[in-house]
Amino acid sequence: MLAELSIKNFAIIEELTVSFERGLTVLTGETGAGKSIIIDAISLLVGGRGSSEFVRYGEAKAELEGLFLLESGHPVLGVCAEQGIDVSDEMIVMRRDISTSGKSVCRVNGKLVTIASLREIGRLLLDIHGQHDNQLLMEDENHLQLLDKFAGAEVESALKTYQEGYQRYVKLLKKLKQLSESEQEMAHRLDLIQFQLEEIESAKLELNEDEQLQEERQQISNFEKIYESLQNAYNALRSEQGGLDWVGMASAQLEDISDINEPLKKMSESVSNSYYLLEDATFQMRNMLDELEFDPERLNYIETRLNEIKQLKRKYGATVEDILEYASKIEEEIDQIENRDSHLQSLKKELDSVGKDVAVEAANVSQIRKTWAKKLADEIHRELKSLYMEKSTFDTEFKVRTASRNEEAPLVNGQPVQLTEQGIDLVKFLISTNTGEPLKSLSKVASGGELSRVMLAIKSIFSSQQDVTSIIFDEVDTGVSGRVAQAIAEKIHKVSIGSQVLCITHLPQVAAMADTHLYIAKELKDGRTTTRVKPLSKQEKVAEIGRMIAGVEVTDLTKRHAKELLKQADQVKTTG
């Protein structure tokens, strides 16, 4: 949810910070006070089109900042992770500065991002619906996802089964495409990898060979130093009156007194052990001295061999193991190319089999969607009826993603289909608002009043299905009154149960339904107009709703009417 909004030097707003709560927040006030400016600021904050005209006159830039609180597992967390944006304590701070040149600087949790990134994140946080806005529900490409969310676990399970087969199908299709490349490309490829395999095999590499050779080279290169040091060490220990003799004498002396007490016994054992360790070391030194031999030809061979391995590493892998793995891989590829026809037939047969299985799963997903689409239509008809649009008809149009006849494509009901991650369906919500009128897409609903009610009916069902945390209605109640106005108010309240809702309204019925009522007013400050926001108390709500009813003068009658609306709203909230 949008927890706090800060605006500075934006249009007529000098500086303003507004806190928002859960549930339904309404913004009311006189025309021109700045209600829509606040919504404009929110729209720009989440990636809307900016302009230098938004910068307050005489200032260098406009500054917008919003704090969003998230629930764990919200999809926006994944998007932020992909973009390297750190999100701690499940909070996102979005900021956008707009200069007088029209350029924007955008940040999310302090990280600079592009407008496109800001918009991508914003779409998952806010859904703004105004009289002319295109928003999530009006965009056809979102309808499949919304239908799947409405269908829930049943379609989710079927889709998961389908996607497992689909991934296997895609891999096979890729292998088939690689094998089906032109003869000339295949011939060139075969020549190349045969040469590479011959080069690797002729080297007769062994695992860890390079490490062993480097160790041996180190030893031969330091022959003189190793021999001299070993000889000196051996002489120091083994010559007449050498170190080993002195340690032996010390051990014998301590042995004579070792049974007097425990400390002497331990001391004797320690020196005795040291003697045997040193004696063993001298044997090893002698053996190594006898084996040491300087062989310049061996050193030359090692250098040549290491250089050969180095050249192979540069071409085929960082280690000998990598080179051998690459050799195994291209050996398999050579076999596939040389036996291409056989592999092609085998692969086509497997692809055809998998494709048939996947097509069955795709058809199953499609059928489940169609079943739930009917349930969705029934629910939306009920919602529209409660908004006094009982003559409206809602339906979901299904089209199959078709493939051309010359493609290697699986068949569903005898028709070649194009498989995608989400199945074979193209889904679009359609509506007719009057008897006898044809069904058309949501974006083609002409009447502002009708569009408002249609969107509210759909949103009352989908508000809990959408990923957005906040929904904004900007004067969606235009062109309605009376019982329709009351129905709209109740529907907006219903939407606010599942999502935070901010609503600019001119309808007293909607204002009465608010959990939080913010009054937007203009005031003069240092000879300039600015905007202020005031949360209304219960008594102030009565006065403001009375003003909305009366238009100008608030009378005792309009106050009574306002109290009646508030009482009615409380009853609606209580009964649900």
Swiss-Prot record:
Entry keyword Transmembrane: no
Query: Which GO cellular component term is one of those annotated?
Result: cytoplasm
Q: Which SUPFAM superfamilies match?
A: P-loop containing nucleoside triphosphate hydrolases
Q: Which family does it belong to?
A: Belongs to the RecN family.
Q: Which organism is it from?
A: Bacillus subtilis (strain 168)
Q: Which UniProt keywords apply?
A: ATP-binding, Cytoplasm, DNA damage, DNA repair, Nucleotide-binding
Quote one Gene Ontology molecular function term: ATP binding
Q: Which InterPro entries match?
A: DNA_recomb/repair_RecN, P-loop_NTPase, Rad50/SbcC_AAA
The major lineage groups are: Bacteria, Bacillati, Bacillota, Bacilli, Bacillales
What quaternary structure, including any partners, is listed in this protein's UniProt entry?
Answer: Forms multimers, possibly octamers; these become larger following DNA damage. Recruited to foci following DNA damage; probably interacts with RecF and RecO.
- What task does this protein carry out? Involved in recombinational repair of damaged DNA. Seems to be the first protein recruited to repair centers, foci that are the site of double-strand DNA break(s), followed by RecO and then RecF.
Q: Which terms under GO biological process does the entry name?
A: DNA recombination; double-strand break repair; SOS response
Name its cellular compartments: Cytoplasm, Nucleoid
Q: What is its main location?
A: cytoplasm
The protein, known as: DNA repair protein RecN
| Gene name per UniProt | recN
